[in-house]
Each structure stands twice: as structure tokens, then as C-alpha cells.
């Protein structure tokens, strides 16, 4: 029977690593039996074992990434694989702060020649 992911998430890292080792050994023995000419039920068990290994690795990687995110939460620089995935154009675009900056000449021009407002008499 296949493992349930929600049950795997409750387990500790050591327990998951131990389970992963057992499944890998089981997969190796199933592959040997396949070469030796095992029955059909053994061959179908290879698929479920591979999927179970993938589930365990997914849960382990998920928890590792979550721990890394917590570690880098308030840091200035975050590793590339933990950063938010954006398009290349968005990553290279100016930040709101950079967009709002003005040159000294522009500041003086706005100060000394403000936009004139006109009221129309109806």
C-alpha cells in the first residue's frame, strides 16, 4: 500500500531518512528479483516503491526549504532558489524607490516653476 503524504509530514527527519533507506533496499531487491524472473506482483510493486521514495524525498526537501526560509527570513540577501520567481524583466526593473528619485535640476524646476492651476468661470 502506498504511503500517505500527510502522515509523512508528521514524522521526524531521522524517521523519514530511515524509512527512505529501507525503501531503497527494498527497491534494489525487487530489481534483482525482476532480473531473476520474478512474478508479476513483484514487478508492479517496483512502481509503488519508486513513488513512495519520491514522496519521502519530497517531504524531506519541503521541510528543508521551509527551515531555510525561516533562517533567511530577515536577512538582507536570500539565496537565489529561495527568492520569489519573477520574470527577467521584472527582476531588472527599477524599484519604487529608484523610480521616485529626482535629479537636483528636476527638483529645482518643480519648486520654482510649479504647475499653474486655472479655474474656469461657468
Curated annotation (Swiss-Prot):
Component of the ribosome, a large ribonucleoprotein complex responsible for the synthesis of proteins in the cell. The small ribosomal subunit (SSU) binds messenger RNAs (mRNAs) and translates the encoded message by selecting cognate aminoacyl-transfer RNA (tRNA) molecules. The large subunit (LSU) contains the ribosomal catalytic site termed the peptidyl transferase center (PTC), which catalyzes the formation of peptide bonds, thereby polymerizing the amino acids delivered by tRNAs into a polypeptide chain. InterPro entries: Ribosomal_uL29, Ribosomal_uL29_CS, Ribosomal_uL29_euk, Ribosomal_uL29_sf. One of its GO terms (biological process) is cytoplasmic translation. Belongs to the universal ribosomal protein uL29 family. It is found in: Cytoplasm; Nucleus, Nucleolus. It holds the Pfam family Ribosomal_L29. It comes from Schizosaccharomyces pombe (strain 972 / ATCC 24843) (Fission yeast). This is Large ribosomal subunit protein uL29. Transmembrane segments: none annotated. The lineage of its organism: Eukaryota, Fungi, Dikarya, Ascomycota, Taphrinomycotina. Keywords: Cytoplasm, Nucleus, Phosphoprotein, Ribonucleoprotein, Ribosomal protein. GO terms for molecular function: mRNA binding; structural constituent of ribosome. Component of the large ribosomal subunit (LSU). Mature yeast ribosomes consist of a small (40S) and a large (60S) subunit. The 40S small subunit contains 1 molecule of ribosomal RNA (18S rRNA) and at least 33 different proteins. The large 60S subunit contains 3 rRNA molecules (25S, 5.8S and 5S rRNA) and at least 46 different proteins. uL29 is associated with the polypeptide exit tunnel. One of its GO terms (cellular component) is nucleolus. The modification Phosphoserine is found at residue 12.
Amino acid at each position: 500500500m502506498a504511503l500517505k503524504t500527510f502522515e509523512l509530514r508528521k514524522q521526524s527527519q531521522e524517521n523519514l531518512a530511515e524509512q527512505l533507506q529501507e525503501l531503497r533496499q527494498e527497491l534494489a531487491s525487487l530489481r534483482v528479483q525482476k532480473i531473476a524472473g520474478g512474478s508479476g506482483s513483484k514487478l508492479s510493486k517496483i512502481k509503488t516503491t519508486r513513488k513512495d521514495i519520491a514522496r519521502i524525498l519530497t517531504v524531506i526537501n519541503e521541510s528543508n526549504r521551509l527551515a531555510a526560509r525561516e533562517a533567511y527570513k530577515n536577512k538582507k540577501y536570500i539565496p537565489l532558489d529561495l527568492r520569489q520567481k519573477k520574470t527577467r524583466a521584472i527582476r531588472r526593473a527599477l524599484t519604487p524607490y529608484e523610480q521616485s528619485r529626482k535629479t537636483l535640476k528636476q527638483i529645482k524646476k518643480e519648486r520654482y516653476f510649479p504647475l499653474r492651476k486655472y479655474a474656469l468661470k461657468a
